[in-house]
Structure formats: C-alpha cells, structure tokens
C-alpha cells in the first residue's frame, strides 16, 4: 500500500484523505486545497497545463447483482449481456455529464444499446443498497467491492472486455514545490 509505506518511512508527514466526487477533487487541487488527488479522470483534468500525473492503478470493473438475479451465477459477464437491465449508474462525477460519463456511455454504444438508467449517483453505498433491494444492477470499479465479504443479497461478477477498467491516477500541480509532496511524487515514480 502506497500510503502506508510512505507513512511508515515519513511518520512526521501527515497524509489526510478526503472522499469527494471527481469534480470536487479536481477543483480542490486546482484551487490549492489539496496537494495531490487520486482520481479517475472524469473531468479531463489532464488537459490542464499546470498539472502532472502518474498512473497508479488500472482497476477492473465488476457487475453488482442481487443474489436472485438470473445472471448472478455467472463467472464473468460482458456489457452486451446487460442489455435490457435497469442500471443503477455510478457516475464518476457529481454533474452527471462529464468526460468520464461520456466514456462509459460510449462503451454502452459499442455494446449496441443505450442503457436503461434508473438511478444515477456518485455514491457507491447508495447504489449497493439499491442493488441489494433488487431495484436494478450496477457496474462498479472492483475497489468498491473488494473488501465486502458476505454482503447481504449481493453478488459481484467480473465484467470482461478490452475497455472494462478504470484508471486511477495521482494528480498534482506542477508548481507545488512542497517538500512532502516531492517526496511522495518520488515514491509514486519509484512504484512504476
């Protein structure tokens, strides 16, 4: 774990974590509220001249289903097999019409259909509660469900396909000369 190993090496540097949607994270970074953010680029922040970034992780996507769903016994699914399902859509953004949303809508288009989106939110917990209540299914990044064991009425099936992943990137302002940030950036570059 990158954060843990950095903290162990530099225990006097406080790493604080905030969980927000991608729009708030990007705005916070550009406004100087954060030294660095870990995000998926749904805001197109990488087009900003004043930022640097590194790929941290490529996370596979999974399909969250309720236990009684006809597809819940499958070992893998592809996006085409989800046609006609009511989708509880986890948006990377609070605005619902972001660069990231456009990317995922394009994946549905390539699969041959427009998704039937029943609900849209950037809050994974709300979406999982609705899936467990059998209101629909959802596609989520695997990090949302990796630690869930014995989740009541939830089944997670890997989504297969060439583009069925999410890239997590570390982003920081190039003009931030803070010593702690520079040490962390070196750690990230060393992890490549």
State the predicted function of each range.
Residues 28-30, 82, 129-135, 170:
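Hydrophobic residues within well-ordered alpha-helices
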Residues 1-46, 121:
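Central regulatory/effector-binding core of bacterial HTH transcription factors
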Residues 40, 85-111, 178-182:
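Secondary-structure junction motif
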Residues 50-61, 65-87, 182:
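Flexible hinge/capping segments at coil-to-helix
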Residues 2-11, 33, 98-114:
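Ligand-binding cleft/hinge of the Venus flytrap
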Residues 155-192:
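A late-sequence structural motif
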Residues 40-48, 102, 107-110, 124-154:
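A ligand-binding cleft/hinge motif common to bilobed small-molecule-binding domains
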Residues 51-62, 142-145, 150-164:
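Short beta-strand->loop
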């Amino acid at each position: 774990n990158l954060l843990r190993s950095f903290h162990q090496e530099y225990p006097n540097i406080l790493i604080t974590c905030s969980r927000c949607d991608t729009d708030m994270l990007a705005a916070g970074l550009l406004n100087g509220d954060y030294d660095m953010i870990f995000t998926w680029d749904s805001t197109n922040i990488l087009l900003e001249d004043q930022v640097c970034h590194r790929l941290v992780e490529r996370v596979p996507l999974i399909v969250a289903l309720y236990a009684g769903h006809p597809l819940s016994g499958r070992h893998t699914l592809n996006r085409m097999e989800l046609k006609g399902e009511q989708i509880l859509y986890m948006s990377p953004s609070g605005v619902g019409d972001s660069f990231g949303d456009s990317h995922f809508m394009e994946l549905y288009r390539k699969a041959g259909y427009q998704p039937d989106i029943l609900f849209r939110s950037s809050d994974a917990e709300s979406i999982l509660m609705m899936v467990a209540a059998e209101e629909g299914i959802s596609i989520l990044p695997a990090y949302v469900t990796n630690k869930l064991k014995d989740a009541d009425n939830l089944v997670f099936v890997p989504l297969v396909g060439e583009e069925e992943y999410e890239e997590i990137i570390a982003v920081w302002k190039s003009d931030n000369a803070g010593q702690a940030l520079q040490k962390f950036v070196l750690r990230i570059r060393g992890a490549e």
